[in-house]
């Protein structure tokens, strides 16, 4: 009660306090005017998902001369990675890659945008008619050595692209192992 009495008398004693806050000399001011819609935007909390991770995305964990570890599963020998599956790929070297060996990539729906080919420890040239056949079907082909092909495949999958990979394990000493495999 006493506080209300003091405030009332203080308000009467100082006429400057009766003016609107925007006219007071010490009142904080914005350098720009916001419309009510702008004010509403600043009062809301928004969350934007920058990237949605798919639990079905393929990821190459590691590789060795014996094969690959894909999503924690070991695959021995050459393999073809499709958007949601892994299959054995019946080729021995890059010289065995033909139109027929690539046919599984153009029979899928949704259509694969790009196939990353890992040719072992070196980047090798594929036969021109094989590349031409893939181009005619609207599928891009990226030929790299297997270590770089694994990294490229992981990157493209992480971007959400519909990607396939045809990988031949690198011979000999080239290997990438995960920490879990190194502990075994």
Swiss-Prot record:
Listed Gene3D superfamilies: MTH938-like
Cellular component terms (Gene Ontology): mitochondrial inner membrane; nucleus
Keyword entries, A-Z: Membrane, Mitochondrion, Mitochondrion inner membrane, Nucleus
UniProt-listed GO biological process terms: mitochondrial respiratory chain complex I assembly
InterPro entries: MTH938-like_sf, NDUF3, NDUFAF3/AAMDC
Entry's localization field: Nucleus; Mitochondrion inner membrane
Pfam family, one: DUF498
Function, as annotated: Essential factor for the assembly of mitochondrial NADH:ubiquinone oxidoreductase complex (complex I).
Name of the protein in its database record: NADH dehydrogenase [ubiquinone] 1 alpha subcomplex assembly factor 3
Organism for this UniProt entry: Bos taurus (Bovine)
């Amino acid at each position: 009660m006493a506080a209300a009495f003091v405030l009332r008398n203080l308000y009467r004693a100082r006429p400057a306090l009766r003016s609107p806050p925007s006219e007071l000399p010490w009142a904080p001011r914005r350098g720009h005017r916001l419309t009510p819609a702008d004010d509403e935007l600043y009062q809301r909390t928004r969350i934007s998902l920058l990237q949605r991770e798919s639990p079905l995305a393929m990821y190459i964990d590691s590789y060795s001369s014996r094969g690959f570890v894909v999503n924690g599963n070991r695959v021995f020998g050459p393999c073809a990675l499709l958007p949601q599956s892994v299959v054995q790929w019946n080729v021995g070297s890059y010289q065995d890659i033909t139109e027929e060996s690539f046919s599984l990539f153009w029979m899928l729906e949704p259509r694969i945008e790009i196939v990353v080919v890992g040719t072992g420890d070196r980047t090798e040239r594929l036969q021109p008619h094989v590349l031409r056949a893939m181009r005619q079907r609207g599928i891009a082909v990226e030929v790299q050595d297997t270590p770089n092909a694994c990294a490229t495949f992981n990157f493209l999958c992480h971007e959400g692209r519909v990607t396939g990979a045809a990988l031949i394990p690198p011979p000999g000493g080239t290997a990438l192992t995960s920490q879990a495999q190194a502990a075994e």
